[in-house]
Curated annotation (Swiss-Prot):
The lineage of its organism: Archaea, Methanobacteriati, Methanobacteriota, Methanomada group, Methanococci. It comes from the Archaea. It holds the Pfam family CxxCxxCC. To H.pylori HP0274. This is Uncharacterized protein MJ0661.
Length: 182
């Protein structure tokens, strides 16, 4: 991991990510289930302020649960992100949604000593948009992964058992769906 030192991106280094999907594919079904209070960067908050045309301090006051000057977390309403429209299940600030939301369902992890773009553990356990199949990570996610690495760092790799449990859950859901259809 020559281009990463203590979870921070070294300048002028292009990051190369391994990809690990392990027979699981993804297609967002726009259900809003994953729209909890995301971690936000100062840059995310500045973009939100510009989009809403209100001062940065006002964004902090109205929409942010905590902020340490570098990163923070948006507030929740009823267990969901303050910017999720409950009726339409759409993000009210989608054009400037936080970086972490752009990367979902993936996360930047270290697997076998390498930076890897793979599924976030929450998505393996609960996402309704995962299915068994050969998935492909769209190019835009690699750009977001670099930014997440730069501003938020990386996570330890998800245990292989989580992928196994996810596949079992997806197979079970697929069988239930087929029985309903027949």
């Amino acid at each position: 991991m020559e281009s990463v030192r203590r979870g921070k991106l070294m300048k002028n280094k292009k990051i190369k990510f391994d990809v690990y999907l392990n027979g699981i594919a993804y297609h967002c079904i726009k259900c809003g289930f994953c729209c909890d209070a995301p971690t936000v960067t100062k840059k995310d908050l500045a973009k939100i302020a510009g989009y809403l045309k209100i001062p940065f301090d006002e964004v902090l006051k109205r929409y942010v649960r905590f902020f340490n000057g570098y990163i923070g977390e948006l507030k929740e309403v009823g267990g969901k992100c303050i910017f999720l429209d409950k009726k339409t299940k759409k993000c009210k600030i989608y054009k400037v949604r936080p970086l972490i939301c752009r990367l979902r369902p993936y996360s930047v992890q270290v697997r076998n000593g390498k930076l890897t773009l793979t599924y976030d553990i929450w998505f393996l356990r609960y996402c309704r948009g995962l299915y068994l199949g050969d998935g492909k990570v769209e190019d835009e996610y690699f750009k977001y992964a670099e930014l997440v690495l730069k501003y938020l760092g990386f996570e330890e790799g998800v245990d292989e058992e989580e992928f196994k449990r996810a596949k079992e859950r997806l197979l079970e859901e697929s069988l239930k769906y087929r029985k309903k259809k027949d």
